[in-house]
Amino acid sequence: MYIPTYEDMLAAHERIKPHIRRTPIRTSDYLNELTGAQLFFKCENFQEPGAFKVRGATNAVFGLDDAQAAKGVATHSSGNHASCLSYAAMLRGIPCNVVMPRTAPQAKKDTVRRYGGVITECEPSTSSREETFAKVQAETGGDFVHPYNDPRVIAGQGTCAKELVEQVDGLDAVVAPIGGGGMISGTCLTLSTLAPETRVIAAEPEQADDAYRSFKAGYIIADDAPKTVADGLLVPLKDLTWHFVKNHVSEIYTASDAEIVDAMKLIWKHLRIVMEPSSAVPLATILKNPEAFAGKRVGVIVTGGNVDLDKLPWN
């Protein structure tokens, strides 16, 4: 198992800079007063495909040699990695095949197709996803770009934390959602070298809390088909992301679906940005654990904004 390095992250940033946005930081006096912390929201929902995953996907696609690239890329994803890989493949002019759960939000499916990705649907379970993908990859021969358990992807995701600490000085902690662990692993990779005094904290839905239970048990515990409003956080940890979680994450906090929806409303209202439920999990956990964040300078990664506006969770 190859563990990506800080140098891999730096190389990834140089590779992807022409194709991504250096996303802005947003703050809210109201949310600072409400939490007792100084919150700095890194708005990855402002990326062209609407999610941070464009970083890792672009690093993987543009790191392929011409012979590999000619065969295209393939992946399985609940949404954002699928759209971001399709976008990166479109930029390079190569094919992209994606396996997605049939229950994935229509907005995410539409985005994949808009960027030229070819979708094969599966049942909303890890086993169905992996079985369906094996068939698709055998038929297409595309390079497998795993949504998170891939050194190229983790190195790319780590560029978000690099920008964050360049934009905001003296962060005591960075909080990011955790599903499979790609973003949190990239954050650990970067901050362990660039800002080792900054704590990395993961935020997870209670109804899909396998990372939390794994963290407490000391080994990977996987749920096959969890259900939560945070549909981007349904996948389990894998060996590579588990390496970063067990060695570098300071804490994992969880929040209920109701708390996640309440936090999502607050962000929509006070930051005035469109973001999806998965992106609200960090604020939900900060609100639920105020003693852990009071008086601290906290970076919060808003991971994506691909939400079906006709199916908002408070409607």
UniProtKB/Swiss-Prot annotation:
What drives induction of this protein's expression?
A: Induced by glycolate.
Keyword annotations from UniProtKB, A to Z: Lyase, Pyridoxal phosphate
GO MF annotation: an example: pyridoxal phosphate binding
Source domain of life: Bacteria
Which effects follow disruption of this gene?
Answer: Abolishes growth on glycolate or glyoxylate, but the deletion mutant strain is still able to grow on acetate, succinate or glucose with comparable growth rates as for the wild type.
Which prosthetic group or cofactor does it need? pyridoxal 5'-phosphate
List GO BP terms, alphabetically: D-serine biosynthetic process; glycolate catabolic process; glyoxylate catabolic process
> Catalysed reaction(s)?
(3S)-3-hydroxy-D-aspartate = iminosuccinate + H2O
Q: Any idea which residues bear N6-(pyridoxal phosphate)lysine here?
A: 53
Gene3D superfamilies for the chain: 3.40.50.1100
Q: What is its EC number?
A: 4.2.1.-
Q: What class of enzyme is it?
A: lyase
In terms of InterPro entries, this protein maps to: BHydaspDhtse (IPR054856), TrpB-like_PALP (IPR001926), TrpB-like_PALP_sf (IPR036052)
Kindly list the positions annotated as binding pyridoxal 5'-phosphate.
80, 179-183, 303
> Where does the chain cross the membrane?
none
Role this protein plays: Catalyzes the dehydration of (2R,3S)-beta-hydroxyaspartate ((3S)-3-hydroxy-D-aspartate) into iminosuccinate. Is essential for the growth of P.denitrificans in the presence of glycolate and glyoxylate since it functions in glyoxylate assimilation via the beta-hydroxyaspartate cycle (BHAC).
Query: Anything further noted?
Result: Iminosuccinate is a labile compound that spontaneously decays into free ammonia and oxaloacetate in solution. The beta-hydroxyaspartate cycle (BHAC) consists of BhcA, BhcB, BhcC, and BhcD enzyme activities. Overall, it converts two molecules of glyoxylate (C2) into oxaloacetate (C4) without the loss of carbon as CO2, under consumption of just one reducing equivalent and regeneration of the catalytic amino donor, which makes it one of the most efficient glyoxylate assimilation pathways.
Q: What is the designated name of this protein?
A: beta-hydroxyaspartate dehydratase
Source species: Paracoccus denitrificans (strain Pd 1222)
